Amino acid sequence: MSEYNFTKIEKKWQNYWDKHKTYKVNEDPNIPKEKRIYILDMFPYPSANGLHVGHPEGYTATDILTRYKLLNGFNVLHPMGFDSFGLPAENYAIQTGEHPKKITEKNIEKFKEQIKALGFAYDWDREIRTHDENYYKWTQWIFLKLYKKGLAYIKEMPVWYCPDLGTVLSNEEVIQTPDGPRSERGFHKVQRKPLRQWVLKITEYAERLIKDLEEIDWPESVKEMQKNWIGKSIGAEIEFSIKASKEKIKVFTTRPDTIFGVTYLVLAPEHNIVDKITKDELKTIIAEYKDKEILKSDLERTSLEKDKTGVFTGAYAINPITEEEIPIWIGSYVLGIYGTGAVMSVPAHDERDFEFAKKYNLPIKQVVSQTGNNEILTKPFTENGISINTPEEFNNLKTEKVKTKVIEWLTKNKKGQKKVNYKLRDWIFSRQRYWGEPIPIIIDDDLNEIPLEEDELPLRLPEIENYKPSDTGESPLSKVQNWVNVKRNGKIYKRETNTMPQWAGSCWYYIRYLDPNNEKEFASKEKINYWMPVDLYIGGAEHSVLHLLYARFWHKVLYDLGYVNTKEPFKKLINQGMITSFAYQDENGILIPNDEVKKRDNKFFSKTNNKELKQIIAKMSKSLKNIINPDDIIKEYGADSMRIYEMFMGPLTDSKPWNTQGLIGIFRFLNKIWAIKNKELTKESAAKEIISGLHKTIKKVTEDIENLNFNTAISSLMIFINELLKHDKNYLEIFKPLTIILAPFAPHLGEELWEYMGEQPSIFKNAKWPKYDPNLIIDNTREIVLQVNGKIKDKIILNKGINEDTLKDIALKNHKIMQNIQNKQIIKIITVKDKLINIVTK
């Protein structure tokens, strides 16, 4: 009897797949559209840390589906590449002087080695790297298309600048904390600073970015996050004249019905009209206030907890309907980057306005009430209701009716109009760094921008000695004079020295996979039409707003220009749950690194002070020393064990804690399959109940893979394997289809068993997914309740009459049971045949 030598088996088949290019895919025109599928992973940033066990979760899910589809006769595109521009490599280069390209490519080789060790079915001939000049040539080409369409422009604007990173950050890359704003990467302090920036007009696509969410199969939570980020609101834009001035102030409001209750206007301190309208005697006070407030973060200025502050400008606006004079203030809680940078303040019907009016003793005029009567207001009434204290034609009407009539009046009298507003801001697209795509623009002495010609692409990064940004905040490229200065037609131009953000390369990489070696086009129309859109995209929920929104924006631009054939890039999106790890917390809630923890009598203690610690579930992190390295797992248990364990831990979309005990159970499961292989292989007919069990398992595994319910598919395989172990022989008519349905989960073992049965490799080229016969499926199952200390923790379907030992084995490996008995002593296990199992612990 041979042993299950997973190391030898896995190396053998990985070498075979590489040598024979088993997973190379071509655009076979004879394969109909319904038999093609594009399955995509969010490609990784190749960090120096390599993979931890959380990374392959999504990759394993797509790999199982890929192999399943191959066995069902599909042409499957399943590529992999690397999002290889980025700050970490540049920061390391600043510290060491080593070129970011060299660092990045070394990291990529480590990533590839780890990914290949897990046996994923990638077509490596389609690998892309965003830092490769043959790739970023086309990123630059897309930028030029955006520029020529009027969607890329230069603007001096207040931006988030991080001195430690030496670059500008987009709003999405800044985290608001109680201690002020910080960079998402590195958690460094950031500040507001006016800088010349390239900006992309994503706002032009705001409505379509919302509307087209209806056409795609994405998690509702992600759709809501995108809708909230875009922040659509419908209302009116109203124009207020200014007393004794030709200037006008535009205000956006979602409640035009409350215009009769406006008692003051508030402008953002940075509003361009402030200096023009401020009375001379107040200019010093206003200037001091502006200087102080502009340095604050948006969150600090708009926080509901913060005290609202403001200063009167001395100027007055005129209410366009009532013609009342209204004082104009500037206030911290109004931001220049949102709406028009001005608000009409109705303290009777808005909480912030109410608070501000109370503080500065400004009038409060009620114009809406629930009953239609005047009421004593102790707090603002912010709901819809009945209009009061308004001109006769607007009085005693419901809110929606008043809104309509006010907008009609404003439009007729040219004082305003109906308006849709978006919270979304244009995308700051430039970075003051070296390690990014150069922007293909040159600039003359008059600051006119001249785009490079397409035959001048790629504009390559020059070699430089120092990767640190200049003291002025400019890119390191600004110091390379022989690169910056360009002579044309006897004139000297300067190159744009900002580079693109890391998001640029990931906005379109899914298209380049279709045609990665094309030197004439970013991808041929034939290949785009053959594969697009991406049928399934799997990645983390942390990309819900940033990458996914930006990629949708670029795709829509390319669609409008006729370069792609679909309005949306990703048909279906799945967010895999996070794989967490155990961490340890002291009595003050402080997390203690794992290497400072010792275990004694099923309890955990600090090595430093011997105090007992609480075991909790936390995100894997270097600081907590709780990262699990897949290399170690593969070495001890094999890639197939790790793959199956990650899928068996729980539903794909759930977060779940890593537990090596569960992995050991999976390793035993694969050894059981090997034990069946070691039995006498016979062509005899199997018993009726075995055949029935096989067809039932095929049905369950097929349905579960289609629905990405991998954990329950594995569970049904386990149940059937346990039944097969009871028999002395290995029936070929059972083992062959069983091997095929096992192969997507454990591809190395699947190939080995396929070859053992005398079949020609690869199983993924030469086998066909078995079909179940409904007539052979006998309903021989029961729902078993799993309890811990009498409380229901889960329910599972098992074969009727399952023996007690098998039931105990399955229950103790169940994810929810394992969570509930972790670090507890099992006193006894009570079973009621075909009904329940109760695990009693203390």
Curated annotation (Swiss-Prot):
Pfam families: Anticodon_1, tRNA-synt_1, tRNA-synt_1_2, tRNA-synt_1g. GO terms for biological process: leucyl-tRNA aminoacylation. PROSITE patterns: AA_TRNA_LIGASE_I. The keyword Phosphoprotein does not apply. It comes from the Bacteria. The keyword Hydrolase does not apply. Keywords: Aminoacyl-tRNA synthetase, ATP-binding, Cytoplasm, Ligase, Nucleotide-binding, Protein biosynthesis. It is found in: Cytoplasm. It catalyses: tRNA(Leu) + L-leucine + ATP = L-leucyl-tRNA(Leu) + AMP + diphosphate. Its EC number is 6.1.1.4. A motif ('HIGH' region) lies at residues 44-55. GO terms for cellular component: cytosol. One of its GO terms (molecular function) is ATP binding. A motif ('KMSKS' region) lies at residues 619-623. Its main location: cytoplasm. ATP binds at K622. SUPFAM superfamilies: Anticodon-binding domain of a subclass of class I aminoacyl-tRNA synthetases, Nucleotidylyl transferase, ValRS/IleRS/LeuRS editing domain. Belongs to the class-I aminoacyl-tRNA synthetase family. NCBIfam families: leuS_bact. This is Leucine--tRNA ligase.
